[in-house]
Amino acid sequence: MDELTYQIAWTCLYPTRLRTIKQWLEQYGSASAAWERLDVEGKKAALDRAQQEREWIDKHDISTYFYQDDNYPYRLRECIDAPILLYGKGRLRVNEGKMLSIVGTRQASERCKSLVRQLVLDLKEMVPDITIISGLAYGIDVAAHRAALEAGLPTWIIPAHGLDRIYPTLHRDVAVQALEKGGILTEYISGTEAEKLHFVARNRIVAGLADAVLVAESKQRGGSLITAKMARDYDRDLFAFPGRPSDDSMTGCNMLIRDQKAQLIENARDLVNAMQWDPVSQPMQTSIFTMPEDITAEQKKILELLQESEDGIHVNLLVMETQRPYSEVAADLMMLDMMGTVKSMPGGVYRMKVES
């Protein structure tokens, strides 16, 4: 039997006793050497199961990542409770580029799903070597994966089960697409079902793999706050989208920001600046814009303000700058949008539409 079989056997024997396994391996130098010195009940059954898994791995072209090996994700290895062994499927480049985990509620609002999509699309332009990580759950998770696929970015799925199944099955198409450029990474052997405790355990992988974690939408008792706490425990940068005080689905995000546990961001530029990542320089383009003739003086003022901002301006700031009622500014923006001169962005931001 090879070393990998013994590594699997240890995780079959003690699936939750990570420190115990690490102590044995560090004392005797290898999984096989430590196994030979072990005398406990269940040893033979664990080794038999490991041999079955070893055959399954070969048959299905599964990659493995042992915590003492060079190919193990170095960010995750820093975490005290990092898995002993990981199983991966797809094209996983675990130690290349930047890593962002995006988490949030399963009952996600269209607004926050749109914010996630725009953030990921913009990150593709600013930091194209980034990977998007999440758990394939309903709501924010799958929105993050889909945005990454749309942008052509690698995305990693971290499930709470083995690689012989997909949960939820409704998202199988997303998982299949993710294999083309990213992949699926888990600590669970085949046959492992998605149980409640497994979801909590996998959250530490979602947090530990990343340079930064974004909580896009969460209530005060949302499961995403568990991932947020783990991210802080691992000294990862933590970010959150802000919400209105009346938004029940954003109370968790607002609490993280209020308690100074997470940094407030509204878009990709905020994230890139906070992380001090060097954005890719975009080629200079000559923007062609002709001021429409059949517009009011108030609409012209709005266009002049928008021309001065590359990133766009929030509608509330336009109200302040023009010193006009919100309803009037919003009506003018709608008219200009219909005319094709401005573009409405997520979060109440407006930009100029220009031709290059």
Where would I find each of the regions flagged by the language model?
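Short, small/acidic-rich helices and loops at N termini and domain boundaries
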Residues: 1-71, 256, 339-341, 346-348, ...
